[in-house]
Swiss-Prot record:
Leader sequence segment: none
Subunit: Efficient DNA binding requires dimerization with another bHLH protein.
Key words, A-Z: Developmental protein, Differentiation, DNA-binding, Neurogenesis
InterPro entries: bHLH_dom, E-box_TF_Regulators, HLH_DNA-bd_sf
Tissue: L(1)SC, SC and AC strongly label the presumptive stomatogastric nervous system, while ASE is more prominent in the presumptive procephalic lobe.
Function: AS-C proteins are involved in the determination of the neuronal precursors in the peripheral nervous system and the central nervous system.
Molecular-function annotations in GO: DNA-binding transcription factor activity, RNA polymerase II-specific; protein heterodimerization activity; sequence-specific DNA binding
More details: AS-C proteins are expressed first earlier in ectoderm and then in the internalized neuroblasts, while T8 is expressed in presumptive neural precursors, once they have segregated from the ectoderm.
Transmembrane annotation, as ranges: none
Keyword DNA-binding in record: yes
Region feature (Disordered): 161-221
Protein name: Achaete-scute complex protein T3
Length: 257
């Protein structure tokens, strides 16, 4: 009985061992099939390694050369620029300079009180104005001046109209005008009379006397030795001189106007 049991046990153990071996073989066979599906890596030779190194060097070479060229270009002096580029840069610098000078002149013509009032205590009151703020304040300042001119013109026109209405109502301007005419006529009449009297005295005959003798010794004796009255003909004198005629003609023409 014991021999039979031992033989059965050995037989079962043998079967288990064979099955395990079969499974291990099957797994090994399956793994080898999977490895065969993947392409095996070809070992690299010396020629392939050299080709790879050359390709890497060729890729790195242009990068280094471009960096070197860029570095050298930055260090190039300005004299090596193209003439067209140099002229363009000079024109641009001149334009920027003119614009800056124009804004400086504009800031100088803006009163500081106007800048402080229009900037509302902002940047313009203490610091340098920007170009945008300068233009904005200049526009507001010009508008304010234009409004002042318009208001002044309108007020002066109203004042003229009001004064004309008042003078037409009270008649004072008319009286002043009459007074001025009367004074001018009186002046012209006096001038005419003086001119006529001057011409009459110039035409009248004038007597001539001889000189007197003065004797010494404390006694003064005047003797009229000769008294020759020389009369020129009245016809030889004209009533009016040429200058008087011109003056009278001018006065008469002025009165007729």
């Amino acid at each position: 009985m014991t021999s039979i049991c031992s033989s059965k046990f050995q037989q079962q153990h043998y079967q288990l061992t064979n099955s395990n071996i079969f499974l291990l073989q099957h797994q090994h066979h399956h793994q080898t099939q999977q490895h065969q599906l993947i392409a095996p890596k070809i070992p690299l030779g010396t020629s392939q390694l050299q080709n790879m190194q050359q390709s890497q060097q060729s890729n790195v070479g242009p990068m280094l050369s471009s960096q070197k060229k860029k570095f050298n270009y930055n260090n190039m002096p300005y004299g090596e620029q193209l003439p067209s580029v140099a002229r363009r840069n000079a024109r641009e610098r001149n334009r920027v300079k003119q614009v800056n000078n124009g804004f400086v002149n504009l800031r100088q013509h803006l009163p500081q009180t106007v800048v402080n009032s229009l900037s509302n205590g902002g940047r313009g009151s203490s610091k340098k104005l920007s170009k945008v703020d300068t233009l904005r304040i200049a526009v507001e300042y010009i508008r304010g001046l234009q409004d002042m001119l318009d208001d002044g013109t309108a007020s002066s026109t109203r004042h003229i109209y009001n004064s004309a209405d008042e003078s037409s109502n009270d008649g004072s301007s008319y009286n002043d005008y009459n007074d001025s005419l009367d004074s001018s006529q009186q002046f012209l009449t006096g001038a005419t009379q003086s001119a006529q009297s001057h011409s009459y005295h110039s035409a009248s005959p004038t007597p001539s006397y001889s000189g007197s003798e003065i004797s010494g010794g404390g006694y003064i004796k005047q003797e009229l030795q000769e008294q020759d009255l020389k009369f020129d003909s009245f016809d030889s004198f004209s009533d009016e001189q040429p200058d008087d005629e011109e003056l009278l003609d001018y006065i008469s023409s002025w009165q007729e106007q």
